[in-house]
Amino acid sequence: MPSSEDYRQFLEVFYPFFLITSLISQLFVIYFILNYTPKQLQTLRYILVNTCVFQVIHVSACYLMQFRQVSNLVPMEVWSYGYGRHFEAFVGYSLYHVVQTSTVASGISVVMTLFLKYEAARNVKLTSWKRYLIITCILLPLVTSVTLEIILIITQSLPNEIRERYKLINVDVKDHSVVGTLNFKVLASQVNVCIMSSSVVMLPIIGLSSRRKLLEHIQKTSDRVSQTKNSQNKMFVKGVILQTFLPLCFYCPISSIYFYCIVTHEEILFQQYFMFLIPAFPALFDPYITLYFITPYRNRVKIWLRMNKVSPKSVTLINVNCNY
């Protein structure tokens, strides 16, 4: 079995590689979103950029702090091996919650994209109050989680006696610092863990349900729109559904090991070092799903790769008229 030192040596190389490749991917797709999104889809453009921003925050915080969740200790401790280990403990503890929030926020942005696409596909303008109600329900888990995390930061890391205790613990920081502990006897922690876990599981369920309804609607209206438009709509839906499954695929396996460690207090180094890194992997794959499954972006990539030979006039038409 790899030792703690083996994991550290690997992650010293992997963290910079992951940061650079993820940021390049995110900046690349943001360029496409800002420059090649049709004008009639500006709201979706903001949602897509929002998703990218949260994923950039997630990856950057992971690299800066390089957390290790020492699950076999009671109470459970969170250590930092990154440059952030030199910060005061409450800063690291706050960034720990930022990482968790970013995971939920980027997933909720995908759900918002699905809702806007569903609304556009039905071609029915919802009343303002009904639209606000749906958006509020979508955002409620995120707002609740952020509120609970603010409470935890204020109560678990900001009191002077706690700050002084961690200053003494980290007075001679070398390879890592202790940024905080996780106390699951605190109600706010319990509720927040439930929100985080249930949100990741619910995203694919919502996605599959929306997929079924969207494809049914596309099928019903297939005789009123072109075959090309139908294909574009189906392709977009497939891409968004795939994006809803990414957090589940990367979050659930490592979280299952995490909950096992909470119950048994067993030391599993892989879980401790990768608990925050693996859920950040969608930030690397998400941009390429967006580029492939959204028609205007895919067409532009093909033009750059000389897979599509079109005149300048045709390029303009693609940017203006292509839909998701």
Curated annotation (Swiss-Prot):
Gene Ontology CC: membrane
Signal peptide range: none
Membrane topology, as annotated: Multi-pass membrane protein
Transmembrane segments: 13-33, 47-67, 95-115, 134-154, 186-206, 239-259, 274-294
Superkingdom per UniProt: Eukaryota
Keywords (A to Z) from UniProt: Membrane, Transmembrane, Transmembrane helix
Keyword Transmembrane helix: yes
Keyword Membrane: yes
Compartment(s): Membrane
InterPro entries (alphabetical): 7TM_GPCR_serpentine_rcpt_Srd (IPR019421), Nematode_rcpt-like_delta (IPR050920)
Any single Pfam family the record assigns to this protein: 7TM_GPCR_Srd
Similarity-based family: Belongs to the nematode receptor-like protein srd family.
Name listed for the protein in its UniProt record: Serpentine receptor class delta-41
Annotated source species: Caenorhabditis elegans
Taxonomic lineage of the native organism: Eukaryota, Metazoa, Ecdysozoa, Nematoda, Chromadorea
